[in-house]
Amino acid sequence: PTFGRKKEDFVFVSGIGCSSRFPYYMNPYGFHSIHGRAPAVATGVKIANPDLSVWVITGDGDGLSIGGNHFMHALRRNMDINILLFNNRIYGLTKGQYSPTSEVGKVTKATPYGSLDIPLNPPSLALGAQATFVARTIDRWQAHLSQMLERSYHHDGGSLIEIYQNCNIFNDGAFEEYTSADKFNNVIELKHGEPMVFAKGTKGIKLDGFTPMVVDMEKHSLDDLLVHDETNLDLAHIVANWTSHPILPEPIGVIYSVDKPTYNSEMVAQVEAAVKQKGAGKVQDLLDSGDTWTVK
């Protein structure tokens, strides 16, 4: 998408991994930073210059393993940064080890008899961390990807876009069912305020209590279906939890979006209030005031 702003207004901060080489491929202003710590670096950038549009580029290994704590707390604080998590369910840069999102039973160089780990669900983790914007898209769905980037850009607060991406070297076909000719039978595109239909209108999603189920539209009407509400946190948890479900379609689109005060705006207000009450102060005056300080 085109945002009508100068290149100098954007900063891209990445960690370590195949996805984190993004700054080299796209030639933006930014940092190829420390393994797992891109959200921390991006936080500093946003606080130092609030006018910048700050984007974090990470992967399922970098962002959810060594960087899981930074990922979680950046979203919890509602820092006004945009996190793009490229999920290919594998460690690619280190030549094909299983990652936090790899399936149970995944055979890799690190798990020759199959992974025993239960895969982590990025949207569910983000919602649990109280993120204010959570979305998912697919690398091959270019128009949809562009829409999600635009929504994230205009969201005032911390945002996560999980991007399903194929790794044709170490995990080829990871998301083939969502990009093949029959993808519309396997994916549901979430649209705020609209009934949940998929498979070109032939199937829908209905709630049985708290459990979503697939129904045949020849036997049901739109009034029977679950209506997506991206402002409903309870519904967002339900939608996120049917990720990689054996029967339900994979949800893509905006899962959750609400407005809350951002950490960076609250911090600026707090500093301004303190300066107004006590004056700006000088670091040198503090250093020259003696060897001890009284904390009141």
Which ranges hold each PLM region?
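Glycine-rich beta-alpha junction loops
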Residues: 16-18, 88-90, 141, 164-169, ...
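Active-site-proximal loop->helix
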Residues: 68-75, 93-106, 125
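Flexible, low-complexity linker and terminal segments
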Residues: 169-296
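Thiamine diphosphate
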Residues: 16-92, 144-146
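Short coil/turn connectors at secondary-structure junctions
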Residues: 6-10, 48-54, 76-82, 86, ...
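ATP/pyrophosphate-binding catalytic subdomain of soluble kinases
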Residues: 132-189
